[in-house]
C-alpha cells in the first residue's frame, strides 16, 4: 500500500532510488492516470508524498547526478503515448519539463551510462500493454 492508504498508483509507476529513498512516480488504475509521487524511507519504514508529476503510467525513470528523470509513459485517459522528459532536482518541490524524446513511447527503460541516460525499447502505441508490439529503439538523453 502506498502513501498511507492510497494504493491507486501501485499499477505501473516509474521507480527510482535517490538518497536512500524509493520513489514511486505516477501510475494508473484502469483508464485513470495518476501524477501522485510517493517516497518510501526504508530506515523509518514510512511513506510520504512527493511533488506530483503530470499524470502518466508505464514511464521510465533514472537517476543522474542527483536528479530523477522520468521519460515518456502513457496516458490511457487520453489514449496516447508520451514523449516528454521531466526532472526533479535535489531539494526541488516540483518537476520541470526538460525536453522530449524523439519518439513517444511507454514501457521503455532508462539507464544511466557514461554520462548519459539511455532509453531502451518500449512501445509506441497506447493501450498496448498486453500486446506483443515492442521496439528496438534506443535513444540517449544528455542532461
Give the ranges of each region predicted by the language model:
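Kelch-like beta-propeller repeat domains
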Residues: 1-143
Amino acid at each position: 500500500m502506498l502513501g498511507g492508504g492510497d494504493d491507486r498508483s501501485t499499477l505501473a509507476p516509474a521507480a527510482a532510488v535517490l538518497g536512500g529513498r524509493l520513489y514511486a512516480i505516477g501510475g494508473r488504475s484502469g483508464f485513470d492516470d495518476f501524477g501522485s509521487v510517493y517516497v518510501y524511507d526504508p530506515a523509518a519504514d514510512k511513506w510520504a508524498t512527493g511533488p506530483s508529476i503530470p499524470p502518466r503510467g508505464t514511464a521510465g525513470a533514472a537517476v543522474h547526478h542527483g536528479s530523477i528523470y522520468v521519460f515518456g509513459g502513457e496516458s490511457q485517459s487520453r489514449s496516447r503515448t508520451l514523449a516528454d522528459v521531466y526532472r526533479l532536482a535535489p531539494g526541488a518541490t516540483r518537476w520541470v519539463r526538460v525536453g522530449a524524446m524523439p519518439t513517444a513511447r511507454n514501457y521503455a527503460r532508462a539507464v544511466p551510462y557514461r554520462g548519459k541516460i539511455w532509453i531502451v525499447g518500449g512501445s509506441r502505441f497506447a493501450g498496448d500493454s498486453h500486446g506483443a508490439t515492442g521496439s528496438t529503439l534506443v535513444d540517449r538523453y544528455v542532461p
